[in-house]
Amino acid sequence: MKALLLIAHGSRRQQSNDEVVELADKLKKNSVGQYDIIHAGFLELAETLIPDGIKKCVDDGATSIVILPYFLNSGRHVIEDIPEIVNATKPLYPEADIKIAPHLGASELMMDLLISSANSTR
């Protein structure tokens, strides 16, 4: 089974964390046939942390996990912190193929999204 773990920074503001969880729930509904399991996880400041999110995916039956950093820029968290946490967690789940996708801001679709968002001003 294939899983997607959407990783955000995490916030002291619970509403911000809830938005990420809600986004993961929307992804579940819109990605039928692409991912069997979709969860949200956080780098820090909120539950579920990355190692716990990976465990949740494996416990749900995932044999392949894509970690998607929900970050716009390739700062330290994207370049160092997330890979370090994922690489430290991988040995705990040798039955799962765990890979990190490029961060959201690296997507070629970002230009269209920015223009569309700017054009939708109120």
Model-derived features with residue positions:
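Active-site-proximal alpha-helix that buttresses catalytic centers in soluble enzyme cores
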Residues: 1-122
